[in-house]
A protein has these predicted regions:
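Residue-level hotspots within the lipid-embedded alpha helices of multi-pass solute transporters
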Residues: 28-33, 72-76, 88, 92, ...
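Transmembrane helix-loop-helix hairpins at lipid-water interfaces of multipass membrane proteins
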Residues: 18-78, 159-164, 263, 267, ...
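Membrane-integrated ABC transporters
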Residues: 1-35, 47-65, 81-86, 90, ...
């Protein structure tokens, strides 16, 4: 948590970029949430009356289809601009962090490098900062913002359409928060080992290239290759375990909850239909299913990048 707060503090240097990115994100989210409402209107107020009257209203249909396409284009444009601004400011922040690390290395005593390979130092300055840029600022922060904004917007819309369904769907939030914390705890171990082994690989590779003449002079080629293979094998094994854990905990649970929610919504409205109290149209049912999917999409994306926050 302390590391995350420190990384978040660098956003103060890019206030303008963050503000513009948030505005673009709000624009994109607003357009995305408006799309299902427009589709609902098309189904209930354009297509259904045409079917009942057996009259094809081409003008009205084209008008609302055009509105639907425009809304989606606005959402795409907002998402694109948000991605551009977030990636741009993440590059500038990564440069600042890399410069600070490099300046800090210059002040370290010589004894610090006695037992630390030069390749590992280089790895910390280059690859580790690149990992922070890609996993935290590009994927993590952007995903976190979009997830929060999208979830708040979806729940507000669902509550406006049907307060009962909105209250029922609220149980998903604590379930996903608890699950995310469980996944983060388990992934932290593998992620730390992954970064440590990657640094060792970089250090061994750097040393073997710089000291190639000495290695050959003392005929240590087989030993160097064996050490590198052992480290590489450990790195691959840790990566495999991390991938299995991430795939199982993120995709499996989210997919299962989505299917259960779909079943629950369909069952709820089916019982109303059988009891003769169904007060929902085809368009409204479509909107509910669409918004339920939009609840899980940001959560699923966030679960896939949660390892980058470790």
């Amino acid at each position: 948590m302390r590391t995350m707060k420190r990384l978040l503090s660098y956003l103060r240097y890019e206030k303008k970029g963050v503000l513009v990115g948030l505005v673009c994100l709000l624009l994109s989210t607003g357009a995305t949430l408006t799309g299902p409402l427009v589709a609902k209107h098309i189904i209930d107020n354009v297509i259904t009356p045409m079917g009942q009257a057996h009259v094809f209203n081409a003008g009205g249909l084209l008008l609302w289809v055009g509105i639907y396409v425009t809304v989606n284009l606005v959402g795409v444009a907002g998402a694109y601009l948000n991605r551009v601004y977030m990636r741009t400011l993440s590059n500038r922040i990564a440069k600042r962090i890399r410069d600070e690390v490099f300046e800090h290395v210059q002040t370290l005593p010589v004894s610090y490098f006695d037992h630390l390979p030069a390749g590992k130092v280089v790895s910390r300055i280059t690859s580790d900062t690149e990992s922070v840029r890609a996993n935290f600022y590009v994927s993590g922060i952007s995903t976190l913002f979009s997830t929060i904004v999208m979830l708040v917007g979806v729940y507000i819309t669902i509550f406006l359409l049907n307060a009962t369904l909105g209250l029922v769907l609220l149980f998903l939030v604590p379930v996903m928060i608890l699950w995310q914390r469980t996944v983060a705890t388990k992934q932290k171990k593998y992620y730390s080992e992954n970064r440590e082994l990657y640094g060792q690989l970089s250090g061994q590779l750097n040393e073997s290239i710089q000291g190639a003449g000495i290695v050959q002079a003392f005929q240590q080629e087989e030993k160097i290759v064996a050490e590198y293979d052992a480290t590489a094998t450990s790195w691959v094994e840790v990566g495999r375990k991390e991938l299995i854990l991430e795939s199982y905990f993120s995709w499996s649970l989210v997919g299962m909850l989505r299917n259960i929610t779909h079943f629950g919504v369909i069952y709820y409205f089916s019982m109303q239909f059988i009891g003769g109290t169904l007060g929902i149209s085809a368009g409204l049912l479509y909107a509910f299913i669409d918004y339920i999917n939009r609840i899980y999409e940001p959560i699923q994306t966030f679960m896939n990048v949660v390892s980058g926050f470790q």
